[in-house]
């Protein structure tokens, strides 16, 4: 489809359908697989296989979006209208913030290694009903794991500001280039008929926008690459039981965005008094 900044067929419906199908698979297939894997009856091979399947589902999501990113779709991918108000605060360049991933991992470790006196009776009863490998998965993490988490977080602290800086520069350049092209085209055609003037200006703006759109596509793909690498690095750095627990927590968090009761409560709280 030819690129046009002012008139293009919105692909938001297509992305909405894709996201809904992906989320449904996450909730109805991935979560049950992981929970089955974390039961005492599951074998090591089942655990490993299901972790790989869920990881692939997450990675494939970003790969699909990367393939769909072009001049026409990038405005919708960076600012997805199909995301609800509960999801929006967690978005960074079109999808979940990479910091969320390591924060989730840290929360597992911190919760398990907090002072035992802080544990309530209900929590203790829950632990009794879980397989020993699950209850002890995050207890006293190895120095190697802690070091690897630090390295992942260090990489994010470098990459995230860099992506944000690229985004700001591209936006400034986009506004400057489009404004200049619009004014120049309008001055050239101001003695012509109004329709011809607008058409000439629109064409010039479209051409100017193409250049900046290419950089926006690159930024979006790089942001997805960071998200993918963080997820894969965490799974690679943890044991199979830890990886399964992390992916279960991540899937549960993402599935929670579709909880209609939670969404309704959030929207009520967001309303001005």
UniProtKB/Swiss-Prot annotation:
Signal peptide: none annotated. One of its GO terms (cellular component) is cytoplasm. GO terms for molecular function: sequence-specific DNA binding. Pfam families: DOG1 (PF14144). One of its GO terms (biological process) is pollen exine formation. It is found in: Cytoplasm. This is Protein INAPERTURATE POLLEN1. Required for the formation of pollen surface apertures, which arise by restriction of exine deposition at specific sites. The aperture length depends on the INP1 dosage. Does not play a role in specifying the number or position of apertures. Acts in a sporophytic manner. Keywords: Cytoplasm. Disruption phenotype: Normal and fertile plants with pollen having normal reticulate exine patterning but completely lacking apertures. Residues 12-267 form the DOG1 domain. Transmembrane segments: none annotated. Expressed only in anthers and in pollen. Not detected in other flower tissues, stems, leaves and siliques. The number and position of apertures is strongly correlated with pollen ploidy. The keyword Cytoplasm applies.
């Amino acid at each position: 489809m030819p690129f046009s900044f002012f008139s293009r067929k919105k692909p938001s419906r297509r992305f909405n359908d894709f996201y809904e199908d992906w989320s449904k698979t996450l909730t109805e297939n991935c979560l049950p697989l992981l929970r089955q894997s974390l039961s005492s009856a599951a074998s090591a091979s089942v655990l490993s296989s299901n972790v790989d399947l869920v990881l692939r589902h997450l990675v494939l999501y970003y790969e699909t979006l990367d393939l769909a990113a072009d001049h026409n779709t990038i405005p919708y991918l960076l600012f997805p209208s199909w995301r609800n108000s509960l999801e929006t605060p967690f978005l960074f360049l079109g999808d979940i913030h990479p910091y969320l991933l390591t924060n989730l991992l840290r929360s597992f470790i911190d919760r398990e290694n907090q002072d035992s006196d802080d544990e309530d009776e209900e929590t203790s009863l829950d632990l009794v009903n879980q397989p020993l490998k699950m209850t002890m998965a995050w207890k006293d993490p190895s120095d190697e794991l802690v070091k690897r988490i630090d390295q992942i977080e260090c990489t994010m602290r470098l990459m995230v500001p860099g992506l944000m800086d690229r985004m700001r520069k591209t936006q400034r350049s986009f506004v400057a280039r489009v404004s200049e092209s619009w004014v120049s085209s309008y001055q050239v055609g101001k003695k012509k008929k109004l329709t011809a003037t607008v058409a000439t200006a629109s064409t010039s703006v479209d051409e100017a926008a193409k250049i900046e759109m290419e950089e926006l596509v690159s930024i979006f793909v790089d942001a997805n690459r960071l998200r993918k690498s963080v997820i894969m690095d965490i799974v690679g750095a943890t044991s199979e039981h830890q990886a399964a627990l992390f992916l279960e927590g991540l899937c549960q968090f993402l599935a929670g965005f579709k909880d209609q009761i939670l969404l309704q409560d959030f929207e009520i709280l967001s309303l001005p008094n």
